[in-house]
Each structure stands twice: as structure tokens, then as C-alpha cells.
């Protein structure tokens, strides 16, 4: 059978707290999400839903980020100025206290070939990094966001913490899944699962570092560059595979730019 899961958001509240000092302002934006987490199981032969195995559970999630604004002269505004976003921190969301992110590292990829192993992929230069201690105050300049070449291959390594008890699906003992998605508006695409099973670019089995490759998409038809949002989600497996396992999830969202190579 095949397991599918997703969130049905029923209520979304946003609050913004501002503090102004001279020509700069700081906004703390919080989102409170409430809804239903749905797990659906289908027979892979008939694709019929197996109602006796699927379930749903309520969830709530808090997401926050800080945004810096600067006062900018604008003669078309009656006040003579407007507030423009200059920088923002990553958006961080969590439900429960079981799983969290320790660090995120993004590398370029070095690929080589040999007659025995075929294509070998190795970690290249470090392109972006952050750790849990700095996320809340790591301001990303709007004019200097992490930038990747269109259709470039990159390597993701995400270190996680799982406070347990862990629910594992096999003898490897990994108790969480780590997903990567991207989007421009409310729509998120390209869900891709990283792994901690020592497969592919993951080097060590169950060391709490999930790794994977991601081929960056293009900026869009007729666009030379464009800004997107990445979403890195950590979800405890007991959330997906047990009805009584609660809802424990951690999400990190970072804006980034995709540009065509000249």
C-alpha cells in the first residue's frame, strides 16, 4: 500500500508587532495555524482508499519571522515616504517539541566518472549555512539573498534532533523524515525527501544528518532571475504512522534567488 498525508488548514491568524526607531523599523510576524492532519492509505494495485488504516488528527502550528523595514523617500505618497523591506530572518514553524533542526548546509556538487562506479558525486564548495542558535537573528538582505544558477545541482545536508521516543519503520532506526519543497505563493511544489540511511550522498547511517541532491529549477519562462521560497520540513514518523502519536513537525523557510547563467 501507499501512504499519503497532508494538512488541511482550517484557520490562519497573523499578528504583526512593530517597533520604530528613526528611519528603520522591525516587525515580528507570527502565524497561528490550526487544522487537520490527514493520513490516507491506498492499495497500490487498485488505488482504492483503505479507510480502516487511514486516520486524521488535529494540529496547531506557530510560525514566526522578523522583518526589517527602512523609510524610503517617495514623492507619490502623501506622507512623502514609504516603508520598504530591507531584510528578513528565515520563517520558522513548529508543532510539538519532539523534532527540530540543528543546522542546514548547502554545497555545490562535484561530479566525476569512472569505469567501475559510473558517476561519482562529491560535496563541493559551501554555498549557504545556518545553525539553530542564529536562525532567529539571521537577517537575509533582500538584495543579497542566497542565489543559485538555474538547473544547477546542489547538495543539502540537514542535521536534526529527535527527542524521542522514535518510531522507526525498519532496522535502520531513523525516526523522522526530512522534506524539501519550493514555491512562489501559497503553492508549494517539488517535494523531495532527503535520507539518513547511508544511501546516495548520505555518508553515515542514522547519524541524524539527512542528505540529498536537488536540481535547481529555472526562474520561469521569459525571466532572467526570480525569487522563490524554500521549505525544509522535519516530521516525526509517529505523526504519520500512528494515530495516537501526536503531531510533531518543524519547518524552516528561506527565500532564495534563481538566475540564468550568462
For each of these PLM feature ranges, what is it?
Residues 1-48, 56-58, 66, 72-80, ...:
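Acidic/polar, low-complexity intrinsically disordered N-terminal segments immediately downstream
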Residues 55-56, 145:
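Outer-membrane beta-barrel domain signature
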Residues 60-63, 200-217:
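Aromatic sugar-binding surface patches on proteins
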Residues 105, 236-262:
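Short beta-strand elements
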Residues 135-164:
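Contiguous beta-strand segments within globular domains
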Residues 164-174, 182-189:
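Solvent-exposed loop/turn segments flanking beta-strands in beta-repeat/beta-sandwich domains
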Residues 182-205:
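Solvent-exposed serine/threonine-rich low-complexity stretches and specific carbohydrate-binding patches
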Residues 219-243:
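Short, aromatic- and glycine-rich surface loops/edge beta-strands on solvent-exposed regions
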Amino acid at each position: 500500500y501507499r501512504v499519503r498525508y497532508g494538512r488541511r488548514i482550517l484557520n490562519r491568524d497573523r499578528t504583526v508587532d512593530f517597533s520604530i526607531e528613526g528611519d528603520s523599523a522591525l516587525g515580528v510576524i507570527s502565524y497561528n495555524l490550526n487544522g487537520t492532519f490527514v493520513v490516507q492509505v491506498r492499495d497500490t494495485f487498485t488505488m482504492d482508499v483503505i479507510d480502516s488504516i487511514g486516520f486524521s488528527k488535529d494540529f496547531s502550528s506557530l510560525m514566526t519571522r522578523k522583518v526589517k523595514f527602512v523609510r524610503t523617500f517617495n514623492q507619490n505618497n502623501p506622507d512623502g515616504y514609504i516603508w520598504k523591506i530591507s531584510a528578513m530572518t528565515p520563517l520558522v514553524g513548529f508543532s510539538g517539541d519532539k523534532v527540530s533542526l540543528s543546522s542546514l548546509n548547502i554545497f555545490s556538487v562535484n561530479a566525476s566518472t569512472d569505469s567501475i562506479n559510473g558517476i561519482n558525486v562529491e560535496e563541493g564548495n559551501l554555498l549557504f549555512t545556518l545553525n539553530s542558535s542564529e536562525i532567529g537573528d539571521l537577517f537575509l538582505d533582500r538584495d543579497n539573498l542566497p542565489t543559485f544558477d538555474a538547473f544547477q545541482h546542489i547538495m543539502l545536508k540537514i542535521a536534526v534532533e529527535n527527542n524521542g521516543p522514535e518510531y522507526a519503520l525498519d532496522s535502520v532506526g531513523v525516526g523522522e523524515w526530512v522534506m524539501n519543497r519550493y514555491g512562489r505563493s501559497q503553492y508549494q511544489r517539488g517535494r523531495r525527501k532527503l535520507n539518513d540511511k547511508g544511501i546516495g550522498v548520505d555518508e553515515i547511517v542514522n547519524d541524524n544528518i539527512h542528505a540529498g541532491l536537488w536540481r535547481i529549477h529555472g526562474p520561469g519562462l521569459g525571466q532572467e532571475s526570480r525569487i522563490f521560497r524554500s521549505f525544509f520540513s522535519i516530521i516525526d514518523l509517529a505523526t504519520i504512522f500512528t494515530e495516537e502519536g501526536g503531531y510533531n513537525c518543524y519547518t524552516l523557510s528561506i527565500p532564495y534567488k534563481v538566475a540564468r547563467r550568462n
